[in-house]
Amino acid sequence: KVPVLTVWDVHDYGLNDAGAEFKHREAAERLFDFVWAIPESDARRARPGVYGSWMLGPEGAQMQIIMLDTRYFRSPLKATDEMGAPGKERYLPDNDPSKTMLGDQQW
């Protein structure tokens, strides 16, 4: 028996490049739980986001797998001011220290 560990793919979230501003993120998470048959007893059902951590393997030879949710809590991306310009095609670097990719829960 092999466990299947799941987290958002680039398009699973429901809107390309969306983060915490996605107004349907809670519905997307419920659908994710349904499609992947996440058990009601799973900790991910009791909190927002689909991140998780699992210990796998026999005693003394275990490994930890950590899967991050980089969409549910992520601050909005900074849109380009010059569409298509080299290095500025869609988004710009954003050094705003108040922005987050993981949110407080995962950090």
Predicted segments with their positions:
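Metal-dependent phosphoester/phosphodiester hydrolase catalytic core
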Residues: 1-107
